[in-house]
């Protein structure tokens, strides 16, 4: 057992990562000279994930370029773990890190991080609900008077917190709740899946041939794609293929032949693959559920455009396989990439409680990226106004309390 590493141009086992191999790998990512290499024995802000501890020590490479480029390489196999520049790290501090609470000491403990985010967002939901309750009560009392005003508050921060809360309070609540649901599982009392989580995908990726049994030699792939930075061995059931990645693109190469050509899974092998999920799960007393396959030429609610995730690669047409099982399963399998999306009742609940509310992936907006982003920007700016005015009121309240306490003494 274990992992074997080979040189890309031979079948000779590669020794442990040495200086020459490290510098050669780094040059693939950035052509600038290396100014410093740090050997890390603990995680830092840009590699905060616990699963990376097995890659220790990790080499952090600094490049002499104006962009402030940094590269993290595993000492175990030379794999690139992180690649970033100064601008990306700056925006991460303003975006991903506070949004996801990606602080190293917390994020490296996955269980603690998950519970922390769930509890913080749950507390946030309670706070927003309380604010909406107060807003409704004030609105009701204000409009009972003889001379009703839109806002009863004269003080600036109170006025703008009240006004922004009226327009954006519900969005702040749904955004906070959906953020919690990004990590929380759908309770089994709502729906208990008939298939174990991930079992369908594991079945479709089972029966993989050994790397040395791929008809297409990986060295021929390297020769055809000299700009490649990474090659992955993949399979759809018995059908082998490679994923070749360079700096900007991904290429899916059929490995069932001795000559490189784009992957194209047939309708028959996709249908047989889905059938295998249910033949492997059933016992002798059970029947295989009804399965229907159709060719989808357009995006729909549960199969949306995710071009950014797949480096702009076209995701249509796709095979849609509908199964008459207790989970109301639908499989979307892209023949040119082998990418599988499995939708069942639980994932539909997840979609409406997280994706739809948090990313505005709603019918009518999914098909128009510009409109969706515009709506999202307006709502996020409004939600930011609610938060900023709320924080200002809280700071002013604490300041007044501290001043009163000082006067007493």
What label would you give each PLM region?
Residues 1-409:
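Conserved histidines in hydrophobic membrane contexts and catalytic metal-binding motifs
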């Amino acid at each position: 057992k274990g992992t074997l590493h080979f040189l890309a141009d031979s079948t000779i086992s590669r020794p442990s990562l040495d200086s020459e191999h490290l510098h050669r790998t780094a040059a693939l990512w950035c052509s600038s000279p290396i100014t410093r290499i740090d050997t890390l024995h603990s995680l830092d802000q840009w590699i905060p994930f616990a699963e990376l501890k097995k890659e220790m020590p990790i080499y952090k490479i600094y490049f002499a370029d104006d962009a402030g480029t940094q590269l993290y390489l595993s000492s175990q196999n030379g794999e690139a773990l992180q690649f970033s520049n100064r601008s990306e790290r700056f925006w991460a501090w303003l975006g991903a890190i506070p949004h996801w609470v990606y602080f190293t000491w917390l994020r490296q403990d996955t269980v603690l991080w998950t519970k922390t985010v769930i509890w913080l967002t749950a507390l946030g939901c309670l706070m927003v609900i309380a604010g909406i309750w107060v807003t409704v009560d004030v609105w009701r009392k204000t409009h009972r008077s003889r001379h009703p005003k839109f806002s009863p508050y004269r003080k600036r921060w109170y006025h703008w917190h009240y006004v922004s809360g009226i327009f954006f309070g519900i969005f702040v609540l749904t955004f906070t709740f959906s953020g919690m649901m990004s990590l929380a599982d759908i309770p089994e009392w709502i729906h208990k899946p008939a298939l174990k989580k991930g079992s369908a995908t594991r079945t479709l990726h089972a029966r993989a041939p050994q790397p040395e049994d791929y008809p297409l030699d990986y060295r021929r792939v390297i020769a055809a794609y000299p700009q490649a930075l990474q090659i992955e061995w993949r399979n759809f059931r018995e059908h082998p293929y490679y994923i070749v990645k360079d700096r900007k693109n991904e290429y899916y190469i059929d490995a069932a032949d001795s000559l490189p050509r784009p992957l194209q899974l047939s309708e028959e092998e996709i249908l047989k693959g889905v059938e295998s999920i249910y033949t492997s799960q059933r016992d002798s007393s059970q029947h295989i559920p009804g399965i229907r396959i159709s060719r989808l030429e357009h995006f729909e609610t549960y199969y949306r455009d995710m071009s950014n995730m797949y480096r702009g690669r076209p995701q249509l047409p796709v095979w849609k396989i509908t199964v008459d099982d207790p989970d109301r399963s639908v499989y979307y399998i892209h023949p040119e990439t082998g990418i599988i999306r499995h939708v069942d009742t639980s994932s539909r609940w997840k979609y409406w409680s997280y994706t739809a509310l948090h990313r505005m992936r709603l019918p009518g907006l999914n098909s128009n990226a510009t409109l969706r982003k515009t709506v999202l920007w307006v709502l996020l700016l409004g939600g930011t106004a609610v938060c900023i005015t709320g924080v200002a009121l809280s700071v002013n309240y604490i300041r007044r309390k501290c001043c009163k306490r000082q006067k007493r003494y």
